[in-house]
Amino acid sequence: MDCMFAHRNSRPHPDPSASVPPRPAWRRGFTLVELLVVVAIIALLISLLLPALGRAQRAAKTLNDAANISQIHKGFLSHANSDPKGRLPTPGLVSRLPVPGAGPGGATATVPGQGEEDISKNNTASLYSSMIAANFVTPEILYSPVEENPIVRQMTNYNFQAYNPAAPAPTFWDPGFYANIHLAPGAGASAVCHTSYAHLALIGDRKKLYWTNRAGSTRPILGNRGTHRGAFSGDNYRLSYTLLFHDPKDTWEGNICFGDNHVNLEKSVIPDTVQFECGSINLKKDNIYTYDDFNSGGCKGMVEGDTWLCIGIGQPVPNFYTCAPERLTNGALPAP
């Protein structure tokens, strides 16, 4: 009996300390000072990286802008390859003047591919709209990634059904494509410019001699817009939206496409490689955003062969072409 009792009481008693988990080691956290130091370092790194990132983004936009311009010119060249004279697209040769005696009973009628050039159609809106209708360019590439002027917007609802050359009154492009860069935003449905890009003014010797697929590597054909009449001082320069296209923002720079399709980022409205001479005027650098109106020397001014890139509006006539005066960043029209 005593043995049995002793056996029952010989079981080991559990150690009370075994059921208590070990106390974790104390961990030291950040002090307020250390946290502020980390935040300051992160802020410093961000301040250093953001400008570099911004510059990289702007450089990428400049490259994409040049690609747009090159692609537009390639569309022009594709059109020129189907023209017997190698002419770049000319709206007045698409929508021509009616032909006397071509209609029933000898009436005057519009005949596709026939008739004299309708010079009044040779403005910027008709040029680009006719190219979209013929699928040589798209509305997307006519809007620049570096655009800053709020009046300029990509056209997203181009009416391809407007192309109807077989209609009794033929139409060849959407007339709702506008290039009214001179208007103020909110001034009506037509107060919009659906393209960012200027082109060689379609008038005079410059059109006759250089609006072709043989223009060469020193002849500008199209590109970024310039300051009003090629200004390089005063408010017409300082307040121009075109100064905001590329870096730096306080000087004008622009992508320009030449006749051989190469695109160069020019640093001045008077590029080193673009020159012109006429009559007794010696070879000189050419301001590519205005026609050279020499006081003497036998030059013909607006109808000469010098480079003049602009956005043309209205209805051109043989001796006059209207270049749209783009509003300044303060909303005012540029000084004449």
Report the location of each language-model feature.
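Amphipathic alpha-helical segments typified by the pilin-like N-terminal helix
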Residues: 27-67
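Compositionally biased, low-complexity segments
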Residues: 6, 13-15, 43, 301, ...
